[in-house]
Amino acid sequence: MVAISMREMLEAGVHFGHKTRYWNPKMKPFVFGSRNGIHIINLEFTVTMLNNALSELRKISARKGKILFVGTKRAASEAIKEAAGNCAQFFVHHRWLGGMLTNWKTVRQSIKRLKDLETQSQDGTFEKLTKKEALMRTRELNKLENSLGGIKNMGGLPDALFVIDANHEHIAVKEANNLGIPVFSIVDTNSDPDGIDFIIPGNDDAIRSIKLYLNAVSAAISEGRSENSVMQKEESLIETK
């Protein structure tokens, strides 16, 4: 079972919050104090809350649940894509389009268009077009891939969201809340923890911290998927006896 220690968190700088003047008072329970005008996060809470979140994500994965990673700011973007890929899950790392969850019917049509363009780019259709038309379709394909490439095979709404920076991704959090989809999120000292089902107080800016969370989450989800495979094998063995 994946678990993160306080030492690992300290080494990754998880305890460093934002400047004290930018804090959200709702984060007060998770603040240890301040140093040089920076809030210090109480890692005793973070260790427990992150490990609880990992346990829950593993259970969701073991039930074949779909988990959507969300991190569109520059520091998180590539790491989000990599982590989701490592555990065969889904991601939004470029820009959150309003209605991505709450207007899924429209999003599904855009995904269909993306897949159609992908097929056209591979089956020689683009080569039969004028240079201008081919260029326009290539641009459309790239734009759709950037926005929807990480969810094109999700096949419906996710069962949970894992978010880096609740503040930056507040639209995604609100949409998930409206649909009753549980939200797991890193919440820094400048963020509002309301609407987050599984709060993980921590630094949401440092790449080392972000990678620590994502590696742990990815590993926990992979563990859950492995548990599911073992259970299926056991069930099939029982049926054949």
UniProtKB/Swiss-Prot annotation:
GO molecular function, one term: structural constituent of ribosome
Classification via Gene3D superfamilies: Glucose-6-phosphate isomerase like protein, domain 1, Helix hairpin bin
GO cellular component, one term: cytosolic small ribosomal subunit
Single biological process term from Gene Ontology: translation
S-S bonds: none
InterPro entries according to UniProt: Ribosomal_uS2, Ribosomal_uS2_bac/mit/plastid, Ribosomal_uS2_CS, Ribosomal_uS2_flav_dom_sf
UniProt keyword annotations, A-Z: Ribonucleoprotein, Ribosomal protein
SUPFAM superfamilies recorded: Ribosomal protein S2
Similarity section: Belongs to the universal ribosomal protein uS2 family.
Protein name: Small ribosomal subunit protein uS2
